[in-house]
Regions:
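N-terminal Rossmann NAD(P)H-binding glycine-rich loop of SDR-like oxidoreductase domains
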Residues: 1-23
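NAD(P)H-binding glycine-rich loop region in Rossmannoid oxidoreductase-like domains
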Residues: 44-84
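Conserved beta-strand positions in the Rossmann-like core of class I SAM-dependent methyltransferases
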Residues: 4, 28, 82, 106
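Conserved glycine-rich Rossmann-like NAD(P)H-binding loop of the short-chain dehydrogenase/reductase
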Residues: 11, 25-35
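Conserved Rossmann-fold NAD(P)-dependent oxidoreductase catalytic core, especially the SDR/UDP-sugar
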Residues: 87-106
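Rossmann-fold cofactor-recognition segment
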Residues: 32-48
Length: 106
């Protein structure tokens, strides 16, 4: 199965990628601020980039682990946090639904 993991540079994202790879899945990791190694840099607030990547890679499953969880950042920039925590998952859902067959979004 082909999996796409957002937030792949985080603690949970790295662990999920490792376990999915160990289970024999093809895994594509996405990150934005701490991109290294085989991770793909993607701005999840860029709808066009999200749709393009999902159309190009055609994953079976997208595992969304990207989020801003620090309260001080939420208070300092609630608009940016909403884009990542609310708007980006909606865009991911639309992009997954546009595939034929559609990808599952977790």
């Amino acid at each position: 199965m082909k999996l796409l993991v957002t937030g792949a540079s985080g603690l949970l994202g790295r662990a999920v990628m490792q376990e999915c790879t160990r289970a024999g899945h093809e895994v594509i990791g996405l990150a934005f601020s701490r991109v290294s190694g085989a991770l793909v840099k993607l701005d999840l607030t860029d709808a066009k980039a999200i749709h393009g990547l999902i159309q190009r890679e055609r994953p079976d499953v997208v595992i969304n682990l990207a989020a801003e969880r620090r309260p001080d950042v939420v208070e300092r920039d609630p608009v940016a946090v909403k884009k990542l925590n609310v708007d980006a998952p909606a865009i991911l859902a639309q992009a997954c639904a546009a595939l034929d067959p559609p990808a599952y979004l977790l």
